[in-house]
Design a protein with these regions (language model features):
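Signature of multi-pass transmembrane helix bundles
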Residues: 1-50, 107-115, 120-247, 321-362
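Helix-loop-helix hairpins and the membrane-proximal interhelical loops
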Residues: 32, 36-76, 83, 99-102, ...
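Alpha-helical membrane segments and immediately flanking helix-loop junctions
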Residues: 73-148, 273-327
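A generic alpha-helix surface/boundary motif
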Residues: 14, 64, 91-92, 121, ...
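Transmembrane alpha-helix boundary signature
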Residues: 54-61, 94-101, 158-159, 219-224
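Intrinsically disordered, low-complexity segments enriched in Gly and acidic/Ser/Thr residues
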Residues: 248, 262-268, 275-280, 285
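A generic, lipid-embedded transmembrane alpha helix
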Residues: 42-59, 86-92, 149-152, 286, ...
């Protein structure tokens, strides 16, 4: 049995465990996670289906601009799609723009799960949840996390067995975008953050308009936006992901419980408080609780947590579920790339925070 199939079987067992615990009135906390997996389909549909339906339209509009530019760089146009999160249209747009399916999968599933997720999800969501006094630490962690995305991407590409020369050429746009974000956050933090927030709102508008237009066309047959994919295409992807998430969340709960003690011991050895260690564990499932917990971490923990979650967020949660739902053979490359980039970011953050005071900011 391959590792990909092992993961799928593990998720399937998680479904049975979650369903069984639900019948036992959530005695072990797995029944609730089973329900959360199904409930995740609503938010997923809101963020995904509109962009999926609009992907052919976006491809037709941007193609004449993006394709020549990326060809000039020697890269596949699919790499452009990595500025969107994998589960927020990045995967579908990569397939629409891509000339090489292997590179499209690399961009839409690996790079988009780190770079795109940071741009359209992590930054906008975090800035709405963290306190003003923590924005300095958030920015520092963000800079470190962004710097390791190209490293994680290379690892993922090598695991996919992409030719090293082709891989390095296609990494160039990612390095350029990461560098622009790093320099922008370093020297024009306010303007850069405002720009990212506007971009996030633009994506939300696009997904809402796309969803409404596709739903209207499905019910009436009247085409509002020419060239859109049918709404059923996006909905079928959401359903596939939802099935996987039914088992992902219960299994993830068990994994987090297993990792809790060893990670807390490790955290104590490197100067992290218990909240910081919990944040690292929770972000493997979802980063939203971590942003809410940031105020209770010591300064070192804040920087390390943000650096880690830039790439590692949802590695064993929604991103695993999404990958398993659309391209199960990509599970290993996605997991390894995100973890490698995340661990690399933590190592760099530990070096940079050696002299950081452990006292919580006031």
């Amino acid at each position: 049995m391959t590792f990909d199939k092992f993961i799928i079987w593990l998720m399937a067992i998680g479904i049975l465990l979650g369903a069984g615990d639900r019948l036992l009135k959530n005695r072990f906390g797995l029944g609730q996670k089973f329900e959360e997996g199904l409930n995740a389909m609503g938010p997923l549909a809101l963020s995904m289906v509109g962009i999926v339906s609009l992907s052919p339209v976006i491809s037709n509009i941007l193609g004449p601009i993006i394709i020549p530019f990326y060809k000039f760089l020697g890269a596949d146009p699919a790499m452009f799609a990595s500025i969107l999160a994998n589960d927020m249209g990045g995967y579908q747009l990569a397939l629409s723009l891509g000339e090489n399916k292997e590179i499209a999968l690399f961009s839409g599933l690996i790079v988009a799960s780190m770079l795109g997720c940071t741009i359209v999800f992590s930054i906008p969501v975090a800035l709405g949840l963290i306190e003003e006094k923590d924005k300095e630490f958030f920015a520092k962690g963000l800079l470190i996390g962004l710097s390791t995305i190209p490293l994680g991407s290379i690892v993922g590409g090598l695991v996919m067995k992409i030719n090293i020369k082709i891989l390095l050429i296609n990494i160039i746009p990612i390095i350029l975008i990461s560098l622009m974000l790093i320099l922008g956050l370093k020297f024009f933090q306010g303007k850069m953050i405002k720009g990212v927030l506007y971009f996030g709102k633009f994506i939300m508008w696009m997904s809402t308009i796309g969803l409404a237009a596709a739903a209207f066309e499905s019910l009436t047959g009247v085409v509002l936006i020419k060239g859109m994919a049918p709404i059923t295409e996006g909905m079928s992807v959401v359903v596939n992901i939802g099935i996987v998430l039914l088992g992902t969340f219960p299994i993830l709960t068990l994994i987090i419980n297993l990792l809790d003690k060893p990670l807390r011991k490790l955290g104590k050895n490197i100067g992290l408080d218990s909240t910081s260690v919990a944040g690292i564990i929770f972000s493997l499932a979802n980063s939203i609780p971590v942003f809410k917990m940031l105020k209770d971490m010591n300064n070192k923990g804040k920087i390390i947590n943000v650096a880690w979650l830039v790439a590692a967020t949802s590695t064993l949660g929604a991103h695993l579920g999404f990958t398993a739902g659309v391209e199960s053979e990509m599970i290993i490359p996605v997991i390894l790339s995100k973890l490698f980039a995340g661990v690399s970011a933590v190592i760099i953050a530990l070096i940079f925070t050696r002299n950081t005071t452990e006292k919580k900011s006031i």
